Amino acid sequence: MSDGGGSVRQRKKSSGDGSGNRARKAKSTGSSGSSTPSTAQQHQMWARIVLMVGIAAIVYFTTFRTREKKFATQREVLELRTQPLDCSRPYLDEISKFAGCIPNQCGRFVSDKIVSPAEAGILLDLARAGFELGQSAGGASILDLHSGALSKGTQFVNVYRLPEAKKLFTNQHINVYRHVKAKVQQAVADNFRLNVDALHLTHPTFFSRLTNVTAKTIHDEYWHEHVDKETYNSFHFTTLLYLTDYGKDFTGGRFVFIDNEGKHNRTHVYIEPKRARVSGFTSGAENMHHVEQVTGGVRYAITISFTCDREYAMADPKFALDDDEEGEEEGGTNEGRMNEP
């Protein structure tokens, strides 16, 4: 009896404990349920997150914006297109020292009517002939007919010391090169209201050959943003003559001006290269630029640079053929190397 009665009491006690546990569990469950957001609260939370993301996106895109603008496309045939700009203060302060060479306004221009396609074709032949004698191991090769510098591997050689050069550069090449340089110089003077005699050819002036080959040296990395006046102290006006067509002879490789508008906004202004197209611009910070990386094909162009400072002026290149002709007239011979100006 005592064992049985004890057992009954024990069962009752256990039963009582179970009720307490269930009560505590129920209380705990109720407490947990009260801390979980309701469906309405969750919707409000997500709405706030979406709103904050939207506001952040609006602030970003109105504060940090890069617009794109096409200044000249490959399909267009342009008589003349210009874009005036305010001169950067350092550029204006320096160029104001040179009477007859102060632009009426800084800016840029592009024209397809300065150089003929036939002239561009002859210069393209000259470039290809020169680059047969040497090319960079990376994607950017240069040929400077004034200094004789020619990319070869990871270094430069003097093209006029190569015997083959005399056979490649013809009288037609030379005459067209000089004639085109004079026409481009006149175009710069006309567009910026300069005295053409106050404008002088300067170094470096060179042919370029760009491909998608991986860069091997810093000289192959042509795509970095820069200001010509900061890179080359002698520059006051920069021009480019394109010898091949964007979208036909090569892809990528567009010329890009970078116009900064305020602290964070900028506009990329594109020129699509076209055979015989000439672009020109003042060389100060108002015309920061770069060239897109070429993704296929070969891009040929000539950079023709001008200065207002006679100290940095250089003469037209004196080719080996000229020396040979002079040597024959004098009854002598020479080594066929370029004479320094």
Which positions does each model-derived feature cover?
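Fe(II)/2-oxoglutarate oxygenase catalytic core
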Residues: 2-341
